Amino acid sequence: MKLLIVFGLLASVYCFHRECSIQECCENQPYQIEDPCPIHYYSDWFIKIGSRKSARLVQLCEGDYGRRIPIHYEMFGNYTISCEPLEINCQAPPVGSLIVRCSYDYDFVEHHDVRVVLDFI
């Protein structure tokens, strides 16, 4: 029984580590986010609205890689400054959470999502 509990805790820590990135930034200052995707992977940034796995994802950048530009939404204000690399105003997302989608393929057919949590200093 104890072994099962220990295994469950280890699995939880491992899963949390792989699906979440915690980064520190100065509040209301421009901040270049460290991309948690592995090297040679494509990354696409979103705001996830809602807590469910099937929650709506709102894309932060558009265009082809090498020429991506921010999409400005009225509800987010000027949250996104630039896209390559992603630079934001260091603040909690106005709604939802910040998500990066990582994929080895350009078309993102197979991907995994990583939640980025900002710790304000």
Swiss-Prot record:
Keywords: Disulfide bond, Signal
Pfam annotation, one family: bCoV_NS8
Annotated S-S bridges: 25-90, 37-102, 61-83
InterPro entries: ORF8_bat_SARS-CoV_HKU3-1-like, ORF8_betacoronavirus, SARS_ORF8_IG
Signal peptide: 1-15
Residue ranges occupied by any SARS ORF8 Ig-like domain in the UniProt entry: 19-121
Miscellaneous comment text of the record: This protein corresponds nearly to the fused 8a and 8b proteins of SARS-CoV.
Protein name: Non-structural protein 8
Species the sequence originates in: Bat coronavirus HKU3
